[in-house]
Design a protein with these regions (language model features):
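Left-handed beta-helix
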Residues: 1-15, 188-384
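Unchanged
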Residues: 1-241, 354, 359-361, 365, ...
């Protein structure tokens, strides 16, 4: 966005590590996780910085523009990635005139106006401000849970399932005062996970900002999504297809530029009989081709092809997958590059041997799951 940057603050984005979405073929770098067809977690993190008018430091920019900080070697958690990013920033950047650094972890989605968080950080004299994400009702997966006092001060950190008392999670997003960075790095040596935050709270003024109290220009509320399971990842994207999605992808006051790509626009064509393609309450990315067929309440990623006679309902179709003629799909996730054969039925009755039915009612179609039979009777991967 044009305009003067938020005074005294710079922001960096940190790559993430793989997690519960590995079955879907999501890259080991979770920052590249596709979302809403046209985005990656990485793009949405940079949109938060840009819309908040937070500049990125010169050390994290190149000819292509702002770049995310690579993760540390090995599979470090959120705290390890944040600490490595601060270590690199403090050793390779000039932070003269900068009082605060915002760190966003790109293994989830957080759309919040960082200017509001910065104001709270300053007004309460915080050294570190953690973005606390309210856990959606019914989610029980363990995560880093925060307990804060009435003054926002951090009281307790633990790796656990959410409770009625502690229902704010931390996914790796924070603001830190530059004066506190040396103490943050020194205090965290030899610690990992939740113990890092516990040590910091013993030595510094650490507060928690409940993002449910935050807002976005044009809509009045912040947005967050932490993909703790395949089911939560699916549900978040089905919500975006609804009439009142939690995140407005078309808010002119908070623009969300799509990931760069080289595909042409989507094309809704006719089938062999002249019947038009229909996509109702869908998110349709660049390069999608529908040759007739019908899609409802679904996300169609880049380069997806839907052949004539196919029907897709409540589905997540990831980049480059192919839905064959007359195939019927309901409540399915078709992973990137996968091929659903002509006439296949997914999510209706018997699950084909090349798909995986889950207890939640979802069906996954992924290359490593799909085994078909060739004409000579030998087993082969369909679409692999």
């Amino acid at each position: 966005m044009a305009g003067r940057g938020e005074r005294g603050m710079v922001g960096i984005v940190v790559h993430g590590s793989g997690g519960p979405l590995e079955l879907l073929g999501v890259p080991a770098d979770a920052a590249l996780t596709p979302f809403a067809g046209s985005y990656r977690f990485l793009d949405l993190a940079f949109a938060t910085l840009a819309n908040s008018r937070v500049r990125t430091p010169a050390a994290t920019r190149d000819a292509r523009g702002p770049q995310a900080v690579p993760p540390p070697h090995g599979r470090g958690g959120g705290a390890a990635r944040v600490l490595e990013a601060l270590r690199r920033l403090s050793s390779g950047s000039r932070l003269g005139g900068i009082t605060t650094v915002a760190v966003l972890s790109a293994d989830h989605v957080l759309q919040v106006d960082l200017r509001e968080v910065h104001t709270l950080h300053r007004d309460l004299g915080a050294d570190v401000t953690l973005a606390g994400l309210p856990v959606p009702f019914g989610e029980r997966e363990p995560r880093t849970m925060l307990l804060a006092g009435r003054d926002h001060g951090l009281i307790e950190v633990r790796r656990a399932a959410p409770t009625a008392v502690a229902n704010l999670s931390w996914a790796g997003d924070l603001l830190v005062s530059t004066r506190a960075i040396p103490t943050v790095l020194a205090s965290s040596r030899g610690a990992s996970g939740a113990s890092v935050l516990t040590r910091l709270a013993d030595r510094l003024r650490v507060i928690v900002h409940d993002v449910v109290d935050a807002s976005l220009p044009g809509v009045g509320h912040a947005y967050w999504h932490e993909p703790t399971s395949i089911e939560t990842y699916y549900a978040a994207q089905m919500d975006l297809c609804g009439q009142r999605p939690a995140l407005d992808l078309f808010n002119p006051a908070w623009p969300l530029p799509a990931a760069p790509g080289q595909l042409g626009p989507a094309r809704m064509g006719l089938d062999d009989g002249g019947h038009a393609a229909h996509a109702v309450s869908c998110l349709v990315a660049d390069g999608v081709v529908m040759r007739g067929g019908y899609a409802a309440t679904s996300v169609l990623g880049r380069g997806v092809v839907v052949e004539c006679g196919a029907e897709v309902e409540d589905c997540l179709l990831m980049d480059g997958c192919h839905i064959g003629r007359g195939a019927h799909l309901r409540r399915a996730i078709v992973t990137a590059g996968a091929v659903v054969p002509d006439g296949a039925e997914i999510g209706w009755s018997v699950t084909p041997e090349w798909a995986q039915a889950r207890a939640s009612g979802l069906t996954i179609v992924a290359p490593r799951l799909r085994l078909g039979t060739t004409e000579d009777g030998e087993s082969s991967a369909i679409g692999a």
